[in-house]
């Protein structure tokens, strides 16, 4: 997933392009935008400066803004081998999507009335509305995937008899684990998976006023918050470890506490007894010792610390496991998971593949989607009689940590959290808790991205004259001379401001994706040609930063529509506009040139000073060739400005006056 790419496009206001980047690697981004655990944010280097970029929330903004505009075209059938997918969770849906793109006829068999598996049955609607799942399911039908709901597969042999050449088992992990304590069969004790499934089907289980939830994972938090929404007056989570060891998403835990859920840490039930219509639960306090196999510190009972509590309902959410029908005749391993070949994903039966939670045990939606995509590739290999080609290259090399001195030079910008409903409002119903950014907030949050690995590199070492210009001008002190006297620019320290690229006299330095000075040059030449053909006057060229106010497109479009003769060249930072670009515009007849950059909202502190220095240098050149220095201006405006075009209006008026004066002078000469 090209996270940097789509975040950068959001920062420029190019939302539909950002959505295209997202969809190129994720078939169901709407689902991930709601429930992804965003491990990418844990790896975000912005956290070394202040807080990570809100990557998942930006994805949510992109899919909310443009999702309905992207229609999934039906895929062409190029293969005759039919494939059956048993189960319709995220792994099954992803596998169907990619197999259909490969040209296979695909049928999904789902035992329940609607597709989605745990997405629909196990995640509360305040986190993932059913209509979001419906939207992604619709894309499958648009592609030509055949869907058979209310169809429980009892025999794989029957599917083969029906002509299916490969089967993908993705039945999830819906079986709740037992607590293993006395009295857990008592009336009033239910399991978390069943409880969430019933609520998602529209049922309203009777819970009483006091509810205990046992567990510390995401399911336990979902159960507790759901119970509170169903009217329980008091909801207690009993968790045997401390909050630091709690595997649930920290954001979800915090929201549960805000909604009135209480968590009793270092407590576990040991016995349940039904008395006088209520549950008497005996608990014991725990202490933490050495880490266990999970890496978390192992809870140990404290002697003589037992105590009793009364509840109306106890909901156990201590884990889940797959429940594979015996008639499938599949080899089952640890945790009731299906055993597969780790490379081919084939089970002990020829033509039968398995994946998702049925193989891994409960995992994340993102992991299930990735597994479904891999399964599609492996099934294709099997049907085409190829052995899977396993890449030996490994993951892309990570960019190293920022140096402390670099961190000090990077501007601190507070993270913009997406808005959420207040606790008193969200605990009343199942409305979506987290709302979506507005346009300005999304653009500003995306601008916090450091664009790691997209900075400068010396592409043409033979051109480098070792003039040390880059060393002198870099505000982050990234370039250095190595032992051989060669300039090096470490990618982990470069902040992609582009100053060295614009100032390098030998043009030996370039910026990695997504910027290339050649693209700016080509765009400038295209605009200069169009301007010459239009004969609009006065002819003014504006180099506009694509971020901030310009990223929204508002100001640039305003100038294009209201100011005849203004031609906009988009750049990824005002500091990247080179002297050659400015002089080229004047060479081709421009009466005026301006550079428009961000004001106080700029993600970098040095942009304005760098641009102003370059403008002053070019103005001296203009004087030398007989042009007025005021023909070149720089503007720095923010989205918060009352009249961001005011300075430009004055500039256009000034250039218009110079243009008319030049006509008079020309007339006198003639």
Describe these PLM feature segments.
Residues 77, 82-86, 134-181, 271-282, ...:
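Feature captures the FAD/FMN-dependent oxidoreductase FAD-binding
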Residues 53, 59-82, 105, 120, ...:
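Flanking helices and flexible, charged tails adjoining ferredoxin-like Fe-S electron-transfer domains
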Residues 61-76, 135-150, 176-230, 332-350:
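Glycine-rich dinucleotide-binding loop and its adjacent helix/turn
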Residues 358-385:
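A conserved FAD-binding loop/helix module that cradles the flavin
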Residues 1-12, 33-62, 107, 111-114, ...:
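Iron-sulfur cluster-binding cysteine motifs and their immediate structural context
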Residues 4-75, 139-141, 158-198, 433-443, ...:
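Glycine/serine-rich phosphate-binding loop and adjoining beta1-alpha1 elements at the start
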Residues 2-12, 19-22, 52-56, 81, ...:
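Beta1-alpha1 glycine-rich phosphate/pyrophosphate-binding loop at the start
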Residues 187-209, 292-362:
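FAD-site-proximal beta/loop scaffold in flavoenzymes
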């Amino acid at each position: 997933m090209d996270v940097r790419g789509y975040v950068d496009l959001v920062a420029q206001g190019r939302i539909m392009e950002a959505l295209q980047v997202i969809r190129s690697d994720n078939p169901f981004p709407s689902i991930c935008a709601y429930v992804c655990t965003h491990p990418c944010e844990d790896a975000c280097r912005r956290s070394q400066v202040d807080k990570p970029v809100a990557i998942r929330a930006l994805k949510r903004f992109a899919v909310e803004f443009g999702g309905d505009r992207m229609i999934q075209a039906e895929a062409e059938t190029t293969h005759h081998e039919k494939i059956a997918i048993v189960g319709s969770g995220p792994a099954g849906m992803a596998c169907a999507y990619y197999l259909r793109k490969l040209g296979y006829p695909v049928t999904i068999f789902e035992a329940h009335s609607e597709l989605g598996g745990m997405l629909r049955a196990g995640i509360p609607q305040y986190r993932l509305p059913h209509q979001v799942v419906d939207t992604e399911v619709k894309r499958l039908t648009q592609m030509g995937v055949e869907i058979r709901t209310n169809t429980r597969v009892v025999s794989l042999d029957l599917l083969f008899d029906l002509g299916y050449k490969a089967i993908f088992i993705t039945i999830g992990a819906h079986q709740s684990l037992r607590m293993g304590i006395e009295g857990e069969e008592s009336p009033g004790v239910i399991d978390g998976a069943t409880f969430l499934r019933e609520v998602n089907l529209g049922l309203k289980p009777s819970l009483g006023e006091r509810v205990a939830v046992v567990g510390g994972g995401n399911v336990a938090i979902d159960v507790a918050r759901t119970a509170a929404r169903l009217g329980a007056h008091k909801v207690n989570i009993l968790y045997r470890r401390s909050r630091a060891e709690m595997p649930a998403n920290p954001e979800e835990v915090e929201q549960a506490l805000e909604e009135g859920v209480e968590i009793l840490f270092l407590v576990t039930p040991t016995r349940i007894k039904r008395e006088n219509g209520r549950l008497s639960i005996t608990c014991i306090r725990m202490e933490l010792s050495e880490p266990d196999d999970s890496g978390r510190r192992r809870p140990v009972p404290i002697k003589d610390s037992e105590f009793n509590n009364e509840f109306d309902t106890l909901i156990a959410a201590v884990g889940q496991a797959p429940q594979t029908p015996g008639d499938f005749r599949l080899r089952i391993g640890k945790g009731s998971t299906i055993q597969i070949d780790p490379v081919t994903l084939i089970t002990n039966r020829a033509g039968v593949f398995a994946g998702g939670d049925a193989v891994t045990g409960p995992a994340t939606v993102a992991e299930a989607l990735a597994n479904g995509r891999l399964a599609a590739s492996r099934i294709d290999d099997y049907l085409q009689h190829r052995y899977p080609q396993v890449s030996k290259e490994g993951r892309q090399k990570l960019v190293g940590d920022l140096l402390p001195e670099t961190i000090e030079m990077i501007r601190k910008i507070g993270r913009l959290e997406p808005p959420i409903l207040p606790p008193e409002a969200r605990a009343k119903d199942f409305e979506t808790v987290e709302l979506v950014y507005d346009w300005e907030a999304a653009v500003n949050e995306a601008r916090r991205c450091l664009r790691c690995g997209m900075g400068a590199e010396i592409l043409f070492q033979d051109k480098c004259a070792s003039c040390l210009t880059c060393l002198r001008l870099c505000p982050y002190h990234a370039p250095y001379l190595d032992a051989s006297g060669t300039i090096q620019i470490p990618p982990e320290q470069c902040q992609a401001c582009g100053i060295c690229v614009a100032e390098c006299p030998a043009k030996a330095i370039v910026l990695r994706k997504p910027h290339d000075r050649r693209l700016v040059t080509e765009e400038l030449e295209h605009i200069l040609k169009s301007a010459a053909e239009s004969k609009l006057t006065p002819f003014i060229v504006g180099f506009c930063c694509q971020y901030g106010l310009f990223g929204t497109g508002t100001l640039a479009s305003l100038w294009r529509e209201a100011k005849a003769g203004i031609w906009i060249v988009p750049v990824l930072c005002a500091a990247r506009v080179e002297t050659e670009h400015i002089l080229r515009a004047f060479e081709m007849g421009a009466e005026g040139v301006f550079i428009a950059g961000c004001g106080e909202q700029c993600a970098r502190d040095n942009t304005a000073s760098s641009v102003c220095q370059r403008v002053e240098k070019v103005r001296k050149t203009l004087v030398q060739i007989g042009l007025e220095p005021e023909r070149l201006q720089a503007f720095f405006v923010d989205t918060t400005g009352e009249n961001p075009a005011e300075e430009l209006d004055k500039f256009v008026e000034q250039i218009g006056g110079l243009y008319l004066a030049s006509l008079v002078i020309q007339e006198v000469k003639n």
